[in-house]
């Protein structure tokens, strides 16, 4: 079992999280961590977590409670040097478990670029079901219905 954990982002670790990067071809699929941290600082329903392997930062999450019963994962990334090692799968499972601790939550949503070749298979393998494109027609929406 990998020693993966999610940690709150504070004044002590925001810089190391903001320095994480995806591969160049992935940059169109996700906002920078720095921008996400700025958004979270000014929006109280935004939750940010650093993904750590042992004590080393390897990725980032941001999710938003869009209403009392729904959380949307808006950002999820693994640093380019740590991709394809199973870290993302483990981290997402930990994040889903943390989100499900809120007993009001009935839906967990994620969106992704439908042209992203890996996303559909990856998210489906963790229980997300595609429900169609977002209202702008840009991103595929996928959902986990939570049964508590």
Residue ranges and their predicted role:
Residues 110-120, 136-139:
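Conserved beta-strand-loop-alpha-helix junction that forms the acyl-donor binding cleft
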Residues 139-148:
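Terminal substrate-recognition subdomain of acyl/acetyltransferases
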Residues 4, 8-74, 79-81, 98, ...:
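Acetyl-CoA-dependent GNAT
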Residues 79-81, 85, 114-115:
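Active-site acidic-Proline motif in GNAT/NAT acetyltransferases
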Residues 99-111:
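Conserved GNAT acetyl-CoA-binding A-motif
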Residues 82, 86-94:
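Conserved acetyl-CoA pyrophosphate-binding loop and the N-cap/start of the following alpha-helix
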Residues 89, 114-131:
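Conserved active-site alpha-helix within GNAT-family acetyltransferase domains
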């Amino acid at each position: 079992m990998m020693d993966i954990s999610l940690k709150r982002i504070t004044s002590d670790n925001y810089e190391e999280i903001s320095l994480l990067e995806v591969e160049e071809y992935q940059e169109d699929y996700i906002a920078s961590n720095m921008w996400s941290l700025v958004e979270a600082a000014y929006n109280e329903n935004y939750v940010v977590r650093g993904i750590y392997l042992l004590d080393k930062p390897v990725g980032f999450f941001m999710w938003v409670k869009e209403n009392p019963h729904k959380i949307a994962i808006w950002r999820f990334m693994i640093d380019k040097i740590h991709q394809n090692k199973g870290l993302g799968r483990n981290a997402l499972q930990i994040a889903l478990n943390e989100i499900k601790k809120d007993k009001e939550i009935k839906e967990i949503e994620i969106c992704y670029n439908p042209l992203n070749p890996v996303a559909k298979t990856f998210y489906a393998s963790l229980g997300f079901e595609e429900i169609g494109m977002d209202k702008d027609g840009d991103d595929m929406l996928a959902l986990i219905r939570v049964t508590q």
